[in-house]
Swiss-Prot record:
Monomer. In cannonical biotin synthesis a pimeloyl-conjugate is transformed into biotin by the subsequent action of BioF, BioA, BioD and BioB. This enzyme replaces BioA and performs the first half-reaction of BioD. A 'suicide' enzyme that participates in biotin synthesis. Catalyzes the formation of (S)-8-amino-7-oxononanoate (DAN-carbamic acid) from (7R,8S)-8-amino-7-(carboxyamino)nonanoate (DAN), a function equivalent to the cannonical BioA reaction and the first half-reaction of BioD. The cellular requirement for biotin is thought be low enough that this single turnover enzyme supplies a sufficient amount of the cofactor. It comes from Haloferax mediterranei (strain ATCC 33500 / DSM 1411 / JCM 8866 / NBRC 14739 / NCIMB 2177 / R-4). It is an enzyme of class 2 (transferase). This is (S)-8-amino-7-oxononanoate synthase BioU. NAD(+) binds at G10, T11, G12, G13, I14, G214, T215. Belongs to the BioU family. Keywords: Aminotransferase, Biotin biosynthesis, NAD, NADP, Nucleotide-binding, Plasmid, Transferase. Its EC number is 2.6.1.121. It comes from the Archaea. The keyword Transferase applies.
Length: 353
């Protein structure tokens, strides 16, 4: 397979780790990155180490996902430094701009794929970003790590536009949905009928809210009594109060995660047969529970069983989000170069059911 160059929109926690993990992947070269204050572009390849050093504890963003601001590219409030000097512009490779996404789009003729490491604090935010690339006649791959079920339908509504542009869009390509729906799709192959898919995840974030503001804010939207709108409007003290109220450990049940619709569109099972929950510990690196996928079904010879897949507790959220996302990116580029355009979920890139 030919070399692949790609861009990252957003240099918060996920975006920075995407750049770092890519340095361990053969055939992948990051050539552009941006956040709300600036952009870095080098078609020969970014100096990832320099960018990571420059943006450590220095992430631009406001955490509220103000998508009416054309500069918005990440979901994390300024972690340890505020102002226009935060984020990518602190890098020697960075250039200040009021329109960072437009700057990436302007370079997109020479970019194979774009990974959207962005917040989803408005349901239509990611779909609107996809539209902007399509309107610019971008031909290539878009990858996101979104979690919200209803967003998949919004992307499907735009599929014709994406196909006309020549875009292959893989949605939900992180840990959950991405890695875990892929595992569920494989586990389902033992059965002729899948009755139930249970996904239970555990994440430890010793670096806490300050270094993971966008992720934590999005997760709070899944708690009972909250939704994406209320989470978006909460100020920093309110977010911290929720964390304190739960002693730093948030438990989620029956989450609106995209795993359900992605498994349904792949023909594995009905969306209503998928349940997702988990525990987030914002004060410890250790996972509070083992991430587990359980697929229950009936085999061709009438046996009922459950296939179980677990992630080792030693693997971090960053490893389980960014490794799969870049893997799906590689697969999507193959499809795109073969002329296969449209919207795909991770399970659709696995063996068919």
């Amino acid at each position: 397979m030919d070399e692949i160059n790609f861009a990252v929109l957003g240099t918060g926690g996920i975006g920075r780790r995407t750049l770092e993990v890519s340095t361990y992947k053969d055939g992948l070269t990051p050539v552009a990155a941006c956040d709300r204050h600036g952009v870095a572009v080098n078609h020969d390849g970014l100096d990832v180490e320099e960018i990571l050093d420059a943006t450590e504890g220095n992430i631009a963003g406001d955490g509220t996902g103000d998508t009416e601001d054309k500069r918005v590219t990440d979901g994390g409030a300024a972690v340890k430094q505020h102002g226009d000097g935060a984020g990518i512009v602190a890098s020697a490779q960075g250039t200040s701009t009021e329109t960072p996404i437009d700057e990436i789009i302007a370079e997109s003729d020479e970019i194979d794929a774009v990974l959207l490491a962005l917040p989803n604090l408005e349901h239509d935010f990611i779909p609107r970003i996809a539209e902007r690339f399509a309107e610019a006649e971008f031909e290539g791959v878009l990858i996101d790590v979104l979690k919200r079920s209803r967003v998949i339908g919004m992307l499907d509504d735009r599929e014709e536009t994406l196909v006309e542009s020549g875009i292959t869009f893989v949605c939900g390509a992180g840990a959950t949905p991405g890695l875990l729906t892929g595992a569920a799709a494989l586990a389902a192959q033992s059965f002729v009928e899948v009755e139930e898919v249970e996904i239970w995840w555990g994440v430890g974030l010793k670096s806490g809210y300050e270094d993971n503001r966008g992720t934590v804010r999005e997760d709070i939207a899944h708690l009972d009594g909250y939704d994406i709108e209320t989470a978006r409007e909460m100020d920093e003290s309110e977010i911290e109060a929720v964390i304190e109220e739960h002693d730093g450990v948030l438990e989620f049940n029956d989450m609106e995660h995209a795993d359900d619709v992605l498994l349904e569109r792949a023909g594995i099972c009905d969306a209503e047969d998928v349940t997702v929950g988990g525990i987030l510990d914002i004060r410890k690196d250790e996972k509070p529970t083992t991430t587990t996928v359980r697929v229950t079904g009936r085999t061709f010879d009438g046996k009922r069983g459950t296939n179980t897949f677990q992630l080792d507790d030693a693997t971090s959220m960053a490893a389980n989000v960014n490794g799969p996302a870049l893997g799906y990116l590689k697969s999507a580029v193959r499809r795109n170069r073969a002329g296969d355009y449209g919207v795909f979920g991770p399970a659709e890139l696995m063996p068919g059911f």
